[in-house]
Amino acid sequence: MRRILSTFILLCAVAIRVATAQTAYWITADDSLRNEPNTWMEFRKDFTLKKRPKKVEARIAADSKYWLWVNGALAVFEGGLKRGPNRTDTYYDVVDLSPYLRKGHNDVRVLLCYFGKPGFSHVSSGQSAVIVDASSIGLVSDASWQSQRLKAYQTCGEPYTNFRLAESNIRYVARMEGQNDLKPSLEIGTWGDGAWGKLAVRPIPQWRDYGVRTAHYDTGEDDQGNVVLSVRLPYNMQMTPCFDVTDEAEGTCIRIETDHVRGGSDNCVRAEYITRKGRQRYESLGWMNGDVLRIIYPKSARLTVHSISYRETGYDCDFEGTFTCSDSIINRFWQKAMRTLYVNMRDNYFDCPDRERAQWWGDATILMGQSFYQLSPRANALVRKAIHELVDWQKEDGTLFSPIPAQNWDQELPAQSLTSISTYGFWYYYMHTGDRETMAYVYPAMRRYLSLWTLDDDGLTYERQGGWPWGDWGTDVDMRLILAAWHYLALQSAINVAELTGHEEDVSDYKQQMQSVMTAFNRCWNGYAYRHPTYHGATDDRVQAMAVVSGLADSTKYERIYETICSQEYASPYMEKYVYEALMRMGHGDYALERFKKRFGQMIADTCHTTLYEGWQEGGYGGGSTNHAWSGGMLTDICEQILGIRPTVAGWKEAIIHPAVSPIHEASIVIPTVKGKLMYAFKDEGNIFRATISIPKGMTVHFIAPNGYALNQRHEMSLKAGTHELVFYKQSP
């Protein structure tokens, strides 16, 4: 019996040791400066495998970013997402290591970048750390991993990045590389505890790596006499700069920046490299964006530049959609809008990729529309992530605010928060994806937020101030009526989601509020335009547009509204999207395109920038970024109003195509829906309207001929999957 008991105790001890060996720990370097901002460190681990496994999933999380090499091969380029699925938790990656593993000896190396400061899209835990859990092969991060803080990585001097960016300006001192101060790592937490909170699986794919491309450069000088090597990039992109140089001495400071180093009138990311003697290759791993990459160094330097290159990375989706039409200006706009969209997608949606990298929800709604009509469905995950983050950051009092995730911003923009949950936000996402699960998840947050909105004695939406009562850039903003229109659209969205998710008991209250808002809103009609009695500025074109797109204005007012909009141009590129939509809905697509070309003409014609501005000119209001997410909204208007394409049953089970008569006489588009690619082309020959429609399996399209056209007296028809050639003839008045 004693022998049996001893054996049992021994087996328990072995089991405990095995279990302990399989525990993954948050680890960090044993260095007193490990939690300073912009700290870089490396972690190494050698291990042996008896055979090569077929599949090994490693769960990896970090504060803040990591690069992973397995047996010398790069397995992950800039892994990890900026922290903040909610206020306390962290995202983790799932990485398949099997393509890089082999029988026998293996080694892994992790390079960690710790931001160490807050930003408008990142929450710092306050502790640099990484955790790796591939327990199926016995590979877990613990004290057996060797690590060191890399002293070659430093921070550039002033000017520093502005307060919105968690990223710092990286300086790399090449003569300090190759250090060997490796020590056992510190174990400072386990999975799901400590400063990093619970761990949520990464909801979007790893970045697409387009590879390193050698670039042509021009040589010039700046006004200080420095050599400036300028690379004209194919377009405004997210990229990491690379170069190959020889320095006959050492200590030359090579500055690395783009034409967006002061994007939006504030300090953005840049980098420096301090040479060692001899030939050296370097890639600056902090991504930056721009149309022009610049490498700058003193004219006195004994430096030979062998090559300059760059690695473009970005959100992993495809430009599956296409569009071309008979109007070259619109084609050029479309290209710029797509570049503006894509460069504003990474960890989250951005308003701009240089100054802020922040997920403002007014911008997100504009980006969402473009994404659904032109990017592959893999992009939908970024929308879903944005939606989840918005509701998971909801304050205890019910307030929704953006940008999120954020550690140094918590102010509500009431108009943008209403936009996010409106028919242009959450419900719009549902119609394009059919994702009922997400709607069920967000509805309680929608209901809580809407409960904060009250009506005044006249029955109109009360002016909720929030933290920043912003309705649009520019002047003459009739804020009471803008809020009322967004409130109305948010209530309509809430009705839709409530009915979808089994909360019908809430619907009657929403409908009563909508009726009250509509009645009170229309009391503000003066016979020519909508104006709130307390507003004393010029009549606001934004309000007239919102009255139309929300349905608050009936068609009897359209001509007066049209006349008012023709005389007012106060909307910024953000709200101008809704102005064009309103004009098209009222049957004035010709003027919408005329106004569009007038107001967007400068930025479309600009050959220096491949993206669209924040304001109406470079350096305008809001900081004057030359790349801003909200300026591509006309792309969605063209799809939905001129081409007349939109889903009518969630998930594109059914769709409508009702083209408008417009100055665009010929066009073709491919829309990569969740059902497959919907293709539509038309040619307007005056008396004949020809259309070709290719419909994917599982979708029904209801085609309505342009006004004034018919086929054998038929104006409408329902079409199933397949390719359809249609010819309509102009009808006599």
Please give the residue ranges for each predicted region.
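Extended, well-ordered alpha-helical scaffold segments
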Residues: 333-336, 379-390, 436-453, 494, ...
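Alpha-helix capping and helix-loop boundary segments enriched in small/acidic/polar residues
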Residues: 32-35, 82-86, 96, 122, ...
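The feature captures the catalytic groove of carbohydrate-active enzymes
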Residues: 267-271, 277-278, 346-348, 352, ...
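Extracellular/oxidizing-compartment recognition motifs
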Residues: 22-354, 363, 378-384, 401-408, ...
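Non-catalytic C-terminal accessory modules of carbohydrate-active enzymes
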Residues: 157-158, 162-172, 590, 594-733
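Bacterial Sec-dependent N-terminal signal peptides
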Residues: 1-22
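Repeat-solenoid scaffold signature
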Residues: 110-129, 136, 569-598, 607
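Aromatic-rich carbohydrate-recognition surfaces in CAZymes
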Residues: 99, 108-112, 119, 272-304, ...
